[in-house]
């Protein structure tokens, strides 16, 4: 997983609350066996509307989604995070995330930045009045900057550390590779062994 330090990209206003994982990517798009190629299913029902924000320039090139409260509710669907990332999003900003979505996002490298709803409203106003406004998100400082506006965001320390280090679950496991190999070397012969890489 690529480490996340800072990201600058066009802000996209998604003025919707309670966006669940089935709205992010409907179940019909979950039949792939790979982890990529899900961008075509992102907000599929809404993208049929030509006036939907992701169908409008410059928002169609955005990488920082500014969403309403309770983003990512519903089922635990890693595909929702993958679809957002496949489309090009690196950050989702909201006043409230579903716990499971927040966890899936952090494990995949998507930053879920939590701010107050007042700050969401100010960001929406700014990027709607000035389409193409770039938003810079600095994970180290936990700041979001857009134009003259600067706000702090919340993220738990553990998820922030994983993102800064670029550690997904496999990366975390590989940090203990010497200990794992030592354990395997000292296991009794009659117990099952893992095959060497």
From Swiss-Prot:
The EC number(s) this enzyme carries: 4.2.1.33
Organism of provenance: Mycolicibacterium vanbaalenii (strain DSM 7251 / JCM 13017 / BCRC 16820 / KCTC 9966 / NRRL B-24157 / PYR-1)
PANTHER family on file: 3-ISOPROPYLMALATE DEHYDRATASE SMALL SUBUNIT, 3-ISOPROPYLMALATE DEHYDRATASE SMALL SUBUNIT 2-RELATED-RELATED
Segments traversing the membrane: none
Alphabetized HAMAP family for the sequence: LeuD_type1
Keywords for the protein's UniProt record, in alphabetical order: Amino-acid biosynthesis, Branched-chain amino acid biosynthesis, Leucine biosynthesis, Lyase
Family stated for the protein in its record: Belongs to the LeuD family. LeuD type 1 subfamily.
GO cellular component terms, A-Z: 3-isopropylmalate dehydratase complex
UniProt xrefs under InterPro entries: 3-IsopropMal_deHydase_ssu, Aconitase/3IPM_dehydase_swvl, AconitaseA/IPMdHydase_ssu_swvl, IPMI_Swivel, LeuD
GO biological process, one term: L-leucine biosynthetic process
Job description of the protein: Catalyzes the isomerization between 2-isopropylmalate and 3-isopropylmalate, via the formation of 2-isopropylmaleate.
Family annotation (NCBIfam families): leuD, PRK01641.1
Quaternary state and interactors: Heterodimer of LeuC and LeuD.
Protein name: 3-isopropylmalate dehydratase small subunit
A GO molecular-function annotation: 3-isopropylmalate dehydratase activity
Metabolic or biological pathway: Amino-acid biosynthesis; L-leucine biosynthesis; L-leucine from 3-methyl-2-oxobutanoate: step 2/4
Chemical reaction(s) catalysed: (2R,3S)-3-isopropylmalate = (2S)-2-isopropylmalate
Domain of life according to the entry: Bacteria
